[in-house]
Amino acid sequence: MLTRKCAIITNPGAASRNKEVEAMIPVIKQFYNEDCIEYIKAPGTLEGGDVMMVGDHFYVGRSARTNEEGIRQFIAILEKYGLSGSEVKLEKVLHLKTGVNYIENNKMLVSGEFVDKPEFAKYEKYVIPEDEAYAANCIWMNGKVIVPDHFPKVAQIVRDAGYEVILVDTSEYRKIDGGLSCLSLRFTAQK
């Protein structure tokens, strides 16, 4: 997880993902000073798909892959840097960003269990229809929103919210439950 103040190296809940962490550390060190790199340590687990940044606040989904201890460590690290975080309990989805994504300007795309979550009541919510729920996992970048291709309702909802849409084919990633947010790290380098 990359914030504007620090990098937080996760400890994935799926053992098959641990090599990803090992591969990322040398790359992260190219962009963040060593004293601003923090680590989630066992028994804590945390996966990036369970973390959604809204300004300086981070919503963290408790899931099969992100546990209470991982969330506790993550929020403690955030607070060390003057940031904040809060837990969101998940009921049905693999990761938080499977069903909710912040697209800036106080706007969120929500689907399924996130439509009525009290944690998100203060945001302007754009409800994604269940038949296109996969595409709730969109990415805001530089005033535009990247949307999975072949989900015309979601693309129109995003346009109606006032954004230019960039369509990306994610069909191969979808086969392994991957979404757009799984494929990117967006950050401003410290160095």
Predicted regions and their residues:
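The feature marks the mature, well-folded catalytic cores of soluble enzymes
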Residues: 1-191
